[in-house]
Amino acid sequence: MDSVTTEHKQEVDDRFDTARITAAVDALAEKHQGREDAFRTAMAQLLKAELIAARAAAQAILLKDRHGRRCAERLCHVQDEIIRILYSAATRHLYRSPIPSGAERMAVVATGGYGRGLMAPESDIDLLFILPYKQTAWGEQVAEAILYCLWDMGLKVGHATRSVDESIRQARGDMTIRTAILETRFLTGDQPLYDELVERFDKEVVQGTASEFVTAKLAEREERHRRGGQSRYLVEPNVKDGKGALRDLHTLFWIAKYVYRVRDTDELVERGVFDAQEYRTFRRCADFLWSVRCNLHFYSGRAEERLSFDLQREIAVRLGYTSHPGMQDVERFMKHYFLVAKEVGNLTAILCAKLEDQQAKPAPVLSRMMARLRPTPAKRRVPDSDDFIVDNNRINVAAPDVFKHDPVNLIRIFRLAQKHNLAFHPDAMRDVTRSLGLINAQLRENPEANRLFMEILTSDNAEIVLRRMNETGVLGHFIRAFGKIVSMMQFNMYHHYTVDEHLIRCVGFLQDIERGGIEEFAVASDLMRKIRPEHRSVIYIATLLHDVAKGRPEDHSIAGAKVARRLCPRLGFSPADTELVAWLIEEHLTMSTVAQSRDLSDRKTIENFAAVVQSVEQMKLLTILTTADIRGVGPGVWNGWKAQLLRSLYYETEPVLTGGFSEVDRGKRLTAAYAEFRNAFAEWPADELDAYIARHYPAYWLKVELPRKIRHARFVRSSEQAGHKLAINVGFDEVRGVTELTIFAADHPWLLSIIAGACASAGANIVDAQIYTTTDGRALDTISISREYDRDEDEGRRATRIGEMIEDVLEGKLRLPEVVARRTVRSKARPFVIEPEVTINNQWSDRYTVIEVSGLDRPGLLYELTTAISKLNLNIASAHVATFGERARDVFYVTDLLGAQINAPTRQSAIKSALTHVMAGDKAVQPAA
């Protein structure tokens, strides 16, 4: 075990009195002599009580010293002693060995994570019972006695019984068994038997197979990352198996142990794998991750490995994090977590470089293929520079001092790799990280360094290169504002990645937009081709910086604009372009907000938006930035509906900005929409097509994407042919994780409230709604609800129940308030706190009062809101329903019962108060009978 174990072993021993407990077990054996079952039960009860007490003591110490590795060592030591006590009891009181024949020998060995000498509170125990030959009755009885007692104590135990020969044979053919034996640790029994296994394993399995083992372990690591999500910046990480988590550290040590034959981690420095600083980083990362994992297990009471939102805040408090202006305690904790994950990745790269030097790890597949196809020298100078070489198709330094003699090389290396399509040699990245101190004010102001950086940002594969710059620390040191958001998470369910990862991904999506050919980016790609050439760099830097001021007390859009005004002149931007970048950052949320939460058929909405964007060129740039930003939030956030909303907002606003001129005017867009719809239904009679097109208002044809229009038309036609007064169609969106209910019914003032109430009574949470009324007074509403079941069949049955309830309410068979009161169950406490906000505005529309509510989402919220609005004697003309993770943002265009705006301050105040109470969940609001 490591030196830390030795250092704290006395402290552990003082808290677990093995001699006292052994004496108590002996007393139980004497008391229950001749009654084996009674003895086993009493012994299990005694040891379970001692284990509970020891765990409680370990948790108390952990909360005090916050040293996770020591806690894991304490827990492991306690478990070791319990197994030794059990072995002693089994061999002295239950199954005494007959006259030793040589066969009645056994070594009890810890394997897996337990073999490392570290245990989380709820971890499994892995044991190997080693026998000299085949299984004997005595060996089977002893192993069973130990195992049954452990199971009676409520422990999860993995076990195997093998001879030395069997262990060696299986280790040769099974990499999992090989890894388990690699980590064995002797507990009790026959030490020479264990020593024989270790010696033979080293000679017969390990020797000459280093490359095979390394390749297998790195492949396992890649597959594990692929299954869990490739990014180490996913905001609910798995502390055991996630990227940059404990399993990566374990893999690193397995490889080092196998290749360098080390037993303890401190030997990694002696063998030259790490220098002293890197070893300290290794220990610091391990201790932090063990602290998190042990606290997770203790707090949850189970083997919980995922840092889910509902656990993050509690773990942050247990680890002593506090809130700072602009950053919550939980956000500071998670930033630390992701910084550690990044360092784990760096350590893995360092080990891989060392292994390649010693040929234990094969060169990357691409490099081997290139070598076969192009038999050039393995190392050559990089074109355009004498300071770097190409080593196996990867860029490396030509001399140890290339960064010291010219610090611009810290930027140049990334540009050269990008320009010549080279991978990065781990040694070069190690040298870069060690040279970060050279990135000072002088280098930041260096024109050549800034020119190279802008070339990196605006050239192919910018996302890949920027990510490497970020992982090495160069990006955060060169642009210090970016350094402040490295590994920063936002404590919400909307953003899937840390802020820095989100920004880098957005740049990648911007490049996808520029390349074109992707249908979901069609509008943005078209606009990208039409912006002024000098504004190409503007949109790239704005995309990289739009969230750079997150985590500050000030609004991040305003603070980010200030960052841009300071930074852009240094990067070579003119005053006018600097101001344009600042404007884009300050307004980067505006277009998304207007498109998703305003009535785009209302002239005032368009005029207000036009006043913000000021020019067609600025609107083009803002549309492109908005598209990349939404797409970069995470999977399922961007969809065809949002793309169509942005398209509609853009083309509705263009004539206002140009005095009536539009590259694609409204009439032409309507004609094109009709034409593509007709093409999709060429088999329909012409008069039926004309009649269907006439049933929808222009806003429908301009705002709804074609695939949805096609589904609507088929659904409406089949419903009417079947004579249904009310029809419901069910669809599933796997990417967004929602079930879509499309309702076709006679329009009704309470229809939205009825739909929302039916969903609430079924426990279905509405995440967005698309609401349309036809010219002949029919409602065509699509409601998206969060999935509850994995199987589509189960989701379909739930949707059918909702539809039947809507029909029963409309026909007067059910009173919705009673159904909702009977069936709606308040959702469990959520980890998020969002202050409810209600805004009432008469400037966003000339005809309607616009009510915007925002707060913590929950099942039944839309029903409560629409019911409250109806009780306030307001008519809902249109509703715009959306959720952003855990935040609901619903906008209602309303009038009073006479069709007028709400102007009286006292009336507005009453509306605001009532809806604030609803958002806060103060009381259930019931509709009028």
From Swiss-Prot:
It catalyses: [protein-PII]-L-tyrosine + UTP = [protein-PII]-uridylyl-L-tyrosine + diphosphate; [protein-PII]-uridylyl-L-tyrosine + H2O = [protein-PII]-L-tyrosine + UMP + H(+). Residues 499-622 form the HD domain. Keywords: Hydrolase, Magnesium, Multifunctional enzyme, Nitrogen fixation, Nucleotidyltransferase, Repeat, Transferase. Its EC number is 2.7.7.59, 3.1.4.-. GO terms for biological process: nitrogen fixation; regulation of nitrogen utilization. It comes from the Bacteria. Its cofactor is Mg(2+). Residues 740-822, 850-927 form the ACT domain. One of its GO terms (molecular function) is [protein-PII] uridylyltransferase activity. It holds the Pfam family NTP_transf_2. PROSITE patterns: ACT, HD. Residues 384-739 are annotated as: Uridylyl-removing. Transmembrane segments: none annotated. Has four distinct domains: an N-terminal nucleotidyltransferase (NT) domain responsible for UTase activity, a central HD domain that encodes UR activity, and two C-terminal ACT domains that seem to have a role in glutamine sensing. Modifies, by uridylylation and deuridylylation, the PII regulatory proteins (GlnB and homologs), in response to the nitrogen status of the cell that GlnD senses through the glutamine level. Under low glutamine levels, catalyzes the conversion of the PII proteins and UTP to PII-UMP and PPi, while under higher glutamine levels, GlnD hydrolyzes PII-UMP to PII and UMP (deuridylylation). Thus, controls uridylylation state and activity of the PII proteins, and plays an important role in the regulation of nitrogen fixation and metabolism. This is Bifunctional uridylyltransferase/uridylyl-removing enzyme. The gene is glnD.
